[in-house]
Curated annotation (Swiss-Prot):
Disulfide bonds join 42-68, 221-238, 344-350, 372-381. This is Probable rhamnogalacturonase B. One of its GO terms (molecular function) is polygalacturonase activity. It is found in: Secreted. The lineage of its organism: Eukaryota, Fungi, Dikarya, Ascomycota, Pezizomycotina.
Amino acid sequence: MRLHAFTLLSLLGLVPSFAAASLSGSVGPLTSASAKAAKKTCNVLDYGAKADKKTDLGPPLAAAFAACKSGGLVYIPAGDYAMSTWVKLANGKAWALQIDGVIYRTGTDGGNMIMIEHTSDFELYSSTSSGAMQGLGYEFHASNNWSGPRLLRLWDVSDFSVHDLILVDSPSFHFSIDTCSNGEVYNMAIRGGNHGGLDGVDVWSTNIWIHDLEVTNKDECVTVKSPAKNILVENIYCNLSGGCAMGSLGADTDISDITYKNIYTWNSNQMMMIKSNGGSGTVSNVVFENFIGHGNAYSLDIDSFWSSMSAVSGDGVTLNNITIKNWKGTEANGAQRGPIKIICPDKVPCYNILIEDFAMWTETGSKQWYSCQSAYGSGFCLKSGSHHTSYAVTTTTVSSAPSGYSAAKMASDLSTDSGSTKSIPIPTIPTSFYPGATPYSALMSKQSTKAAKARAVDMSVETPAAASRSEQVVQGAPQETGQSAPESAGPVPSGNPGPVPTGGSRPSRHRHGHHHFGSAI
């Protein structure tokens, strides 16, 4: 049974009807991890894995998956594991992967360390919220090699979730969601090197909900690529990152019904960018709402002549029905890079662009500019009218701060980047991702701790062995930076979705995908 699906923003009445679409249906796994584990549990230690940071985890993980791929839970207990051969876990159904240990890359092949493909009803998570993949990318980057392996990729996966996982220092991209559907990604921390090409999350899929993530790197924070439809991205903390984006966009672009909401961007390349250079196709029905930025180079940057990508054949990508609403904060230097830059193709001008409640101000100097080219709509430098002809760049310079630009900051804003030539410690997953917004789901470690404490109260019905298991689960809280996850007694099924953020409503999850039970099996 599925919960009734609805479109979040249309219910709230916050945006025009043309841009109200977000999710098109329910997301998440069809059955709970506890039900999968009850059917069968495949512990990688039983297939030859050793938590000694030397023995290759690849073959035992593949063997455990083969035993549980038709229904079950693959379990990687707490501890430190080396991984020198990559795994492609394909054609699974109704299975889960619980990573409570830390996986260290020791191999040097390209490709993807863990790739999940052609799979349905799937969940990937850490019950302690401290399971991690440590890519040790600095070993590549120190010699100027940026083409090493990616950490995690999902391809052709439906009805899934990925949560409570930490991805660190990938030699290349961290997490790609490729041609998937009905998925939820949440409660994650991604910490990469300070260089381009080390993307946080890239998604080109259908009906995906991405929320409550922190990303540190110097390229994509959470970026939508083509083709993509019905994607909701919210409560995102781009903490010294590249910033969120769409693109790069090329030929036959097909992106529609995308919402970014509650996006906090600190000391990054941009708050939001749509990037292309030539090409064809469309981007339509898009909402960028509730953005806070501080210290970023660019704020809103729509660039249809982006020089960092090679020109693609075509008149350009058509952008239409785009709403930019409730942006506040500051940019690094508004005289150098103004807070609004909308540069559209001359042969296919942008239209129906709406900018409202936009108040940004410069941190350096006393003036800033807004710039538009071949762009139509309402607000700032946009031209009005229904006859959309090309026009040259128009720039408006202002020397007084707009009212209401002041915005909150996050207490965890980083003061220094991670560099790219030294080891990056494993962070903890934060419990806040946007000022004033409560995450939709509590961390697994918090849920497990509460459940274990509740179980420990009733000692009259609990055996000494069970009490020991409860105590171990209580210890499964996030660890200090750089430490390994604690040992646990066994797999802990994922569980109850947490509180709804203030003023928001929860998009539909599959009924059985997130009923977390908390205690050990």
